[in-house]
Design a protein with these regions (language model features):
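Positively charged, small/polar-rich N-terminal and surface patches that mediate targeting and assembly
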Residues: 1-105
């Protein structure tokens, strides 16, 4: 069972909470963590952006990953939302098994 941390940026904590709750309640993610007040700097449509955003981190497995990404895209208001998956290469086996159990593996 391969587990992942999914890093997602959102416009604010309200959107992060909405998406995170959906992911957990629909068993696409075992849990979600939200960090408020992140500063993001980037170029979008040839304009420099310096924005305040929130970060949503979800934990899931390979089996649920594709559906999780699609669910976030459907609920996100950004045209091109940041949704990246990072494999968990090691960790507490009990916690990793809990993740798998929560998402139905």
């Amino acid at each position: 069972m391969q587990t992942f941390l999914i890093y997602i940026t959102t416009r604010d904590t309200s959107q992060a909470r909405e998406i995170g709750r959906y992911l957990v309640e629909s068993r696409l993610a075992a849990c979600a963590n939200i960090f408020d007040g992140m500063n993001s700097m980037y170029i979008w449509q040839d304009q420099f952006q310096d924005d305040q955003e929130a970060v949503l981190i979800a934990k899931t497995t390979q089996v649920r990953l594709k559906d999780l990404i699609e669910a976030v895209k459907e609920r996100h208001d950004y045209e091109c939302p940041c949704i990246t998956a990072m494999p968990i290469v090691a960790g507490n086996p009990d916690f990793l098994n809990w993740i798998a159990g929560q998402v139905g593996e």
